[in-house]
Swiss-Prot record:
Keywords tagged on the record: Glycoprotein, Host Golgi apparatus, Host membrane, Host-virus interaction, Membrane, Transmembrane, Transmembrane helix, Viral envelope protein, Viral immunoevasion, Viral matrix protein, Virion
Transmembrane parts of this sequence: 26-46, 57-77, 86-106
UniProt protein name: Membrane protein
Topological region Virion surface: 2-25, 78-85
Protein family (similarity comment): Belongs to the betacoronaviruses M protein family.
Function noted in UniProt: Component of the viral envelope that plays a central role in virus morphogenesis and assembly via its interactions with other viral proteins.
Length: 228
């Protein structure tokens, strides 16, 4: 029997001229996309625009699956064994970190019941009970004090607007910040009225425990929280 040997297929490689031509063709589109992403990341804060902040969170959330796909692609089309080894390590690390993100987000969701638990930027959720409605908003840092400000009926917590139609008498005695492993309780330590419809209050961290629900009572705080 006659056996035929197939010639190996040549490996296609980009030349410098092709790379320059690609940049010339897609430079405008890439510039617009990078400008859009930069603006979103720069100005995406809850204290500025909630819509822009949500778009920012979507972009950050998409980074993980995109990174995993690119790492897997590098594993399939690795240039050599060294690149293959690094690609496998990066793929495993990316998948583990993504799984950890979902595990922590689900734990935080069980604690708060808020979809803000899946925020990829932070695991700190500030919970404020106003007239029986619990407002949950993400905060970046673990603050020792929280500030509530009311300006002509508009309520702001740490600079984030929560709603309108409130007065200083509506401010709760306690505010909570939920984390993955515990819940921090902040007690109102100072209240000052600027005029008849404006003022502010300062809350100081007073208690840390493993609870599921934020307090919604001015007294009897331990009975208002369900221990996990």
């Amino acid at each position: 029997m006659n056996s035929t040997t197939q010639a190996p297929q040549p490996v296609y490689q980009w030349t410098a001229d092709e790379a320059i031509r690609f940049l010339k063709e897609w430079n405008f589109s890439l510039g617009i996309i990078l400008l859009f992403v930069t603006i979103i990341l720069q100005f995406g804060y809850t204290s500025r625009s909630m819509f822009v902040y949500v778009v920012k969170m979507i972009l950050l959330w998409l980074m993980w699956p995109l990174t995993i796909v690119l790492c897997i692609f590098n594993c399939v089309y690795a240039l050599n064994n060294v690149y293959l080894g690094f690609s496998i390590v990066f793929t495993i690390v990316s998948i583990i970190m993504w799984i950890m993100y979902f595990v922590n987000s689900i734990r935080l969701f069980i604690r708060t019941g808020s979809w803000w638990s899946f925020n990829p930027e932070t695991n700190n959720l500030m919970c404020t009970d106003m007239k029986g409605t619990v407002y949950v908003r993400p905060i970046i840092e673990d603050y020792h004090t929280l500030t509530a400000t009311i300006i002509r009926g508009h309520l702001y917590m740490q600079g984030v607007k929560l709603g309108t139609g409130f007065s200083l008498s509506d401010l709760p005695a306690y505010v909570t910040v939920a984390k993955v492993s515990h819940l921090c309780t902040y007690k109102r330590a100072f209240l000052d009225k600027v005029d008849g419809v404006s003022g502010f209050a300062v809350y100081v961290k007073s208690k840390v425990g493993n609870y599921r629900l934020p307090s919604n009572k001015p007294s009897g705080m331990d009975t208002a929280l369900l221990r996990i």
